[in-house]
Amino acid sequence: MAAAAAAGANGSGGSSGMEVDAAVPSVMASGVTGSVSVALHPLVILNISDHWIRMRSQEGRPMQVIGALIGKQEGRNIEVMNSFELLSHTVEEKIIIDKEYYYTKEEQFKQVFKELEFLGWYTTGGPPDPSDIHVHKQVCEIIESPLFLKLNPMTKHTDLPVSVFESVIDIINGEATMLFAELTYTLATEEAERIGVDHVARMTATGSGENSTVAEHLIAQHSAIKMLHSRVKLILEYVKASEAGEVPFNHEILREAYALCHCLPVLSTDKFKTDFYDQCNDVGLMAYLGTITKTCNTMNQFVNKFNVLYDRQGIGRRMRGLFF
């Protein structure tokens, strides 16, 4: 209302103000300060980027991805430490989260990271829109006051394209409406994360940066295998052309190809068979020992339950004997 009044008073300058107001997303709350302090780990950003890149490679076009945020919360301090992907379906142009998949993944993460809890969800794209509100309401059915993180992988800015929001309820036109309030966040890193981020930073897209020893070794191996493949393919094409009579026989080249084939390791020797069978027996024995251990554990649980049941029945008999 105040913006409209200012627009009417200022004439042409007011129309400019109305355009600015129209550009503000309708799902954003204005004049609201964050109620929590957020510390974001680089691992979360790397996970989201990897998730988006894999989906873009599989689909051949940029895709919106959705996942869960996990970490720790102490009072008003929230530390987002990790994330995992979520399954979603589109029904009538609305995104529906697969909650059964979420509960399965949550149980798996609880077995490994018992101290971490579900904090919210993430997605990719531009500024928040009503579709994000729709998904956020579904997440609110799982936990109260979840965080919402949005990463824009298509931005051209040099700043980190990550925004964190919390939901607030505002009265608009007499109705309670859910809106997003942006939160400020800080980056928190551990030693392992610093090493990983430094390694990724060195691996630039142009290759002009300093590469790690492992990366250089893998690149050299890839180049050598690629060269070997092209040379073997050339020899094979020459042999086929010679057999078909398309090119004259060159006995020197054929002898060299024959000698090259005999340089390959022979896998039909007795020593290879002995080592191969020994390794197979070792693997089979390890699997067998694992099965025996699991069976013993099951039997132990059965015996414990049987003993508990037997003790209860014995106590019941003694108690009945006392009454008689």
Curated annotation (Swiss-Prot):
Protein name: COP9 signalosome complex subunit 6
Main subcellular localisation: cytoplasm
Signal peptide start and end residues: none
MPN domain residues: 38-171
Protein localization: Cytoplasm; Nucleus
GO molecular function, one term: metallopeptidase activity
Family: Belongs to the peptidase M67A family. CSN6 subfamily.
InterPro entries documented for this protein: EIF3F/CSN6-like_C, JAMM/MPN+_dom, MPN, MPN_CSN6
An example Gene Ontology biological process: protein deneddylation
Keywords, ordered alphabetically: Cytoplasm, Nucleus, Signalosome
Any single Gene Ontology cellular-component annotation: cytoplasm
PANTHER family listed in its UniProt record: COP9 SIGNALOSOME COMPLEX SUBUNIT 6 (PTHR10540:SF8), EUKARYOTIC TRANSLATION INITIATION FACTOR 3 SUBUNIT F-RELATED (PTHR10540)
SUBUNIT field: Component of the CSN complex, composed of COPS1/GPS1, COPS2, COPS3, COPS4, COPS5, COPS6, COPS7 (COPS7A or COPS7B), COPS8 and COPS9. In the complex, it probably interacts directly with COPS2, COPS4, COPS5, COPS7 (COPS7A or COPS7B) and COPS9. Interacts with the translation initiation factor EIF3S6. Interacts weakly with RBX1. Directly interacts with COP1 and 14-3-3 protein sigma/SFN. Interacts with ERCC6.
Top-level taxon of the source organism: Eukaryota
SMART domains: JAB_MPN
Keyword field contains Cytoplasm: yes
Summary of the function given for this chain in its UniProt record: Component of the COP9 signalosome complex (CSN), a complex involved in various cellular and developmental processes. The CSN complex is an essential regulator of the ubiquitin (Ubl) conjugation pathway by mediating the deneddylation of the cullin subunits of SCF-type E3 ligase complexes, leading to decrease the Ubl ligase activity of SCF-type complexes such as SCF, CSA or DDB2. The complex is also involved in phosphorylation of p53/TP53, c-jun/JUN, IkappaBalpha/NFKBIA, ITPK1 and IRF8, possibly via its association with CK2 and PKD kinases.
